[in-house]
Amino acid sequence: MSCLPVLLLLQLLVSPGLQAPMTQTTSLKTSWVNCSNMIDEIITHLKQPPLPLLDFNNLNGEDQDILMENNLRRPNLEAFNKAVKSLQNASAIESILKNLPPCLPMATAAPTRHPIRIKDGDWNEFRRKLKFYLKTLENEQAQQMTLSLEIS
């Protein structure tokens, strides 16, 4: 007995023509879930020792503005990627940060100011600013997801 008919059937089953097409909404949902999972994983790592000082959640207004500015998303991520290299025991966060660029929105204009500054080796500052940055990014993605679902 030949296995040729079985191979032909298998090829038909896995060929792209017979699979359900990916819609923009499906693709957006999948990418949003992946980004959300990466953000959650980083935040979990940020909650591990060394523990932050009491002023963990305090960010000045200028830092908040810089971290929320859409046109600074990529430069800010680059600043976090640079700063994470100066921290001990941060390799897990570093590897996730490297995968985060597809989650960032496209800049609509050139940045008008410098990205966030993070002191080398300062876990507390790094943690405080990165957590705010990630929460802002996550909120923005949730809003985009809601808008795309309303449109479709």
Swiss-Prot record:
Pfam families: IL3. Disulfide bonds join 35-103. Keywords: Cytokine, Disulfide bond, Glycoprotein, Growth factor, Secreted, Signal. Glycans are attached at residues 34, 89. Activated T-cells, mast cells, natural killer cells. One of its GO terms (biological process) is immune response. Its main location: secreted. GO terms for molecular function: cytokine activity; growth factor activity; interleukin-3 receptor binding. InterPro entries: 4_helix_cytokine-like_core, IL-3. GO terms for cellular component: extracellular space. The keyword Glycoprotein applies. It is found in: Secreted. Residues 1-19 form the signal peptide. Monomer. Granulocyte/macrophage colony-stimulating factors are cytokines that act in hematopoiesis by controlling the production, differentiation, and function of 2 related white cell populations of the blood, the granulocytes and the monocytes-macrophages. Belongs to the IL-3 family. This is Interleukin-3. It comes from Hylobates lar. The gene is IL3.
